[in-house]
Regions:
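Bacterial Sec-dependent N-terminal signal peptides
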Residues: 1-40
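Extended soluble regions of mature proteins
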Residues: 30-110, 114-230
């Protein structure tokens, strides 16, 4: 009887240790979940000059970004057109796909041409504030960006809870501050207020990084010189 009870105790101990080991593996897998592949959904608001405000209804209000490794792809769709921007951080590659019912163009941008396409920030100072709020489920810290020339200020919110590769919407911002969850950037004659609505980690469709057949290749200069009606 003694030997039988001792055998049972040892077996129970082994079962307990096995269960603890499996639980630890599960917790480690959750804690160290990869963040190099997934998607982000952004909400976009526009500030246009009075003479152009009538066009705001044609602009995309949502951007979906997929990221994997060194690559990102940003997709913005309106009622009549879609713009897809593919980037690769390692090679400084950027490709823009323009698609509508009447045209399909592909434009490759070198590093020097990219600023005009993705927008810029003027020379500015960045000051961290004490404000903290939750955006898309992540704790974000507030920063005030002040234009050195005009004195105009805008705010941006960054989180360090996660680490995500910059994409065409965020690459003008200082990545050392964290992942931007809400910010304003200037693009040509308009300003874009961008806010993250959702972040998801997991496999992304491989096809989103490819260029469909049938797109006509243009240079950035050819695109700029193209009449609007085309």
């Amino acid at each position: 009887m003694y030997l039988f009870r001792k055998f049972q105790q040892e077996r129970n101990m082994k079962n307990t240790l096995t269960a603890v080991f499996v639980l630890l593996l599960f917790l480690c897998a959750c804690k160290y979940k990869t963040t190099d592949e997934g998607s982000i959904i952004y909400h976009i608001e526009y500030q246009l000059p009075d003479s152009l405000k009538r066009y705001v209804k044609y602009l995309p209000k949502v951007a979906t970004v997929y990221f994997k490794g060194d690559s990102t792809v940003s997709i913005q769709k309106s009622n009549q057109e879609s713009t897809t921007i593919i980037t690769d951080k390692k090679t400084n590659f950027m490709r823009v796909l323009l698609n509508s019912a009447f045209r399909q163009y592909v434009v490759d941008y070198n590093k020097a041409d990219q600023a005009e396409e993705i927008g810029t920030l003027p020379p500015h100072t960045t000051t961290k504030q004490k404000d903290i709020k939750t955006i898309a489920g992540y704790q974000a810290a507030k920063y005030v960006l002040q234009d050195k020339l005009s004195g105009e200020t805008t705010e941006a919110w960054f989180t360090k809870d996660i680490s995500i590769l910059p994409n065409s919407l965020t690459m003008v911002l200082d990545s050392t501050l964290g992942v931007p969850l809400a910010f304003t950037i200037s693009q040509n004659v308009m300003k874009m207020k961008v806010t993250v609505q959702q972040v998801k980690f997991g496999p992304v469709p491989a096809a989103v990084f490819s260029t469909p057949k049938g797109y006509k290749l243009l240079t950035p200069q050819q695109l700029r010189e193209m009449p609007v009606q085309n």
